[in-house]
Amino acid sequence: EQGRITRQQNKDVITNLAVEAGLSIPNKEIVDTGTLPQTLKYPIITKVLASTMGAWKDDVHICNSEAELIEAYKKIKSPKLCLQEYIHKKGEFCMEGFSINDGKDVFIPLVCNYQRYYDNSYGHYMTFSPFTDDSLKQKICTLFQNTKYNGIFEIEFMRGPNDEIYFLEINFRASTWNYAMT
């Protein structure tokens, strides 16, 4: 199907598919830039819907109040945004693998945990271990069946303050650390 991957790179589309697969996501609202959230409580984080929109990472802002969001809107280039509840995470982890047969067969050998020593960094170190969480793997497999994706991918998650797991995104490509699998 022409354009399917491009459509699934949209944060609203892929997070809706993730929820259908049984994965949890941070609460969100899709808004026109300048529109205040109707259901979210602060703090929130602003994200572009796709990396091809706006100023991509420069449009990401953590806002602790309505006043901070209004100020952030003055800098944001994207016409439409995904506003998400900002979760003070314990950490992030991801997996790299591949799916074939329109997402019916998924291979994920390793999980990578980012080692964060500072709140304002993604982590300078990573640890790799076998991916053994069967419950999470089943949900990921369902997500890939929903996407019908064939190819290499990286899928990212965040661990919340009470160890809850939130889906963040899929990159439909190899990541920079994929050498660890080979």
Segments (PLM) and residue ranges:
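Active-site-proximal flexible loops/turns
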Residues: 54, 163, 176, 180
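Protein kinase-like catalytic core scaffold
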Residues: 44, 106, 166-169
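Active-site nucleotide/adenylate-binding loops and adjacent lid/helix of ATP-dependent enzymes
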Residues: 5-82, 87-89, 99-103, 126, ...
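A short glycine-rich, hydrophobically flanked beta-strand micro-motif that places a catalytic Asp/Glu
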Residues: 150-162
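ATP-dependent carboxylate/phosphate-activation module, predominantly the ATP-grasp catalytic core
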Residues: 85-147, 171-182
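ATP-binding N-terminal substructure of ATP-dependent carboxylate-amine bond-forming enzymes
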Residues: 1
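A short, glycine/Asx- and small/polar-enriched loop/turn
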Residues: 38-42, 160-166
